[in-house]
Amino acid sequence: MRNVQIFSTDTDDGVVSVVAKTGPGEHRQVKQIRVGNAPRGGVKFTKGGRGFVCNTSQNTLSEIDAVALTEVRRIEVGHGPRGLGILPGDRYVLVSNSGSDSLSIVDLELNVELRQIPLGRDPRHMMISSDGAWAYVCVWGDGYVSKLDVSGLKNGDAAAVHEVAQIPVDREAHPYSLNIDPSGRRVFVANTQATYVTVIDVATNETHRVDVGYIGGRGVAFSEDGKYAFITVETVARIYVVDVETLEVTRHIPVGPGPRGLVVDHNDFTAYISNFARASVISLPEEDKNPAFGPNTLTMVDLKSAPLDRQEGEFEYEEIFVGYGPCSVVMFDLDTIPEEERLNRVDRVEA
């Protein structure tokens, strides 16, 4: 039996809903963790199960314990924190502050903000390269992706972190979130106000466009082998599948209303998508056969149940209920933490 938990960031309720996944089609909600006001973005975890989520209506991060399923503390950052990323080694976290137009560097041993770096208008979500050298941040209000050299943090030098490039997307495109493909060669950017996905060549910073036909890009994930990128498009309740090598759309997948965040479980090749829609106002294409799911749920899609390389067949789905306003979803495998440590952490909470 697997010991995996799904964490849904539920903005309107101010909670993180926790759903246990013990096997295919086996899901049950086990807890709703109260955090700060208007949490946004996926919970990001250290290897030891320290989770962090942005409280956008405040100037804090909430830390939650993946084992005890409780809020541990809040850490002050800039105004309107929106996205974050944890550097390899789990010592530092970067936070984009949409209200302060800045990037915070937080020391996770001291649990304090070390400094803020000015960015463009309204920075949103980010990713950090696997070697811990670079951070890419969507600057939503100014239409570019900020590339920062964060390699100094390997030696604890927060003062060395600096912006090295502003990679243009389009001022009207509003780049919202991004992800780095498993090979580390390309960055895929979801744009909320453009009908295309922007793809950045990491080596050259050159950009390419992949047309999806509709505005409303929100989240990006990849298959484990790096062959396919999956992009949620909120306005038409679809996931678009893109061949990473050819940069061609191979198909779309109808999902629940208002899809935003998504995560792929590489163990059984299922995807989980946040259905953010507060009401049924999504314009669904007539040719789609969307699952009849409501808002405030997750859509689970079995990505093995139909081809990904062509528009053929229908996928198998499951609806999972969470809190109000789910905007992001992540997974954490509790079996990566030794059993003795898990038991000790639960005992400390119950004592």
Task: Mark where each language-model region is.
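Predominantly soluble domains enriched in secretory-pathway, periplasmic, or organellar proteins
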Residues: 1-351
